[in-house]
């Protein structure tokens, strides 16, 4: 069973005045339900078992992983990295981590899961409305308390591994505190794919994700907030990239 949080229909304020691609504005949103947690390895495993699906990283052998100690922003291609071994085979696989968010999957892989499950990815606006949880601003919490809510990189840089919160990469979903409407990990843990395009998109292969990840820190990335929007290739498979699902809200009976 997937636990859902209902977001009522209405007009919501999104964006920020300083963002060209996500300016401050009001958007009309239909009622929808959003998964309380990010999609897990266990749920993705069920999908693969039922369908025999093969992910982009498995086909192309170009999963992207981060190696602490290299350059600050350096991600490397690892032929052994895919959703079974999201950080490469040498670091072990998902055994014992079935309640962690699935990673090293592409936007296309996430869409394939959604088609099988009869759900969809949140739109850019839906994601932000849910992430804000009724708050108005870049963060739904006091920025000084972010590490109570988000699995993010705690070190000053990426030159040394950081386990100050007990997690070098992903954490089990629901480990940290939820946002005001009960969603877990909307900041940190993994970036979450969203449907929709931005005005600045110049290529058909561009897709978007939000919320930041375990890799993000104050000095790099810093996307663990409600307003920033990341861009990724439709086939790219990173070890800090996952997704959350939504469905249209059920109409009340009577």
Predicted feature residues:
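Functional-site microenvironments in short loops/helix caps that host divalent-cation chemistry
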Residues: 6-7, 13, 17, 54, ...
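Low-complexity, Gly/Pro
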Residues: 1-2, 43, 114, 216, ...
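Short, structured beta-strand segments at or near domain termini in extracellular proteins/domains
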Residues: 239-252
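C-terminal, low-complexity/hydrophilic appendages and adjacent surface loops
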Residues: 19-22
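Hydrophobic pocket-lining residues within nucleotide cofactor-binding pockets
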Residues: 12, 32, 39, 214
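Short capping motifs at secondary-structure boundaries
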Residues: 32, 46-56, 117-118
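Short, solvent-exposed alpha-helical surface patches in non-cytosolic proteins
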Residues: 36-48, 106-112, 128
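A short N-terminal beta-strand-loop micro-motif at the entrance of redox/enzyme domains
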Residues: 26-31
């Amino acid at each position: 069973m997937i636990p859902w949080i209902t977001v009522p229909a209405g007009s919501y304020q999104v964006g920020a005045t300083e963002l060209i691609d996500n300016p401050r504005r009001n958007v009309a949103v239909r009622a929808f339900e959003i998964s309380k947690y990010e999609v897990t390895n266990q749920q993705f495993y069920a999908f693969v078992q039922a369908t025999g699906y093969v992910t982009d990283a498995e086909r192309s052998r170009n999963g992207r992983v981060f190696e602490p100690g290299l350059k600050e922003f350096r991600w490397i291609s690892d032929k052994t990295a895919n959703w079974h071994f999201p950080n490469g085979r040498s670091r072990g696989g998902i055994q014992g981590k079935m309640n962690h968010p699935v990673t090293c999957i592409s936007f296309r892989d996430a869409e394939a899961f959604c088609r099988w499950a009869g759900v969809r990815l949140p739109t850019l606006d839906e994601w932000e409305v849910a992430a804000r949880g009724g708050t108005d601003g870049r963060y739904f919490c006091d920025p000084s308390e972010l590490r109570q809510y988000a699995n993010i990189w705690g070190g000053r840089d990426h030159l040394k591994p950081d386990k100050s919160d007990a997690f070098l990469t992903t954490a089990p979903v629901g480990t940290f505190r939820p946002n005001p409407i009960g969603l877990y990990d909307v900041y940190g843990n993994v970036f979450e794919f969203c449907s929709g395009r931005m005005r600045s998109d110049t290529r058909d292969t561009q897709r978007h994700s939000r919320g930041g990840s375990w890799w993000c820190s104050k000095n790099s990335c810093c996307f663990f907030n409600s307003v920033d929007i990341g861009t990724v290739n439709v086939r790219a498979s990173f070890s800090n990239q996952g997704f959350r699902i939504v469905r249209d809200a059920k109409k009340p009976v009577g």
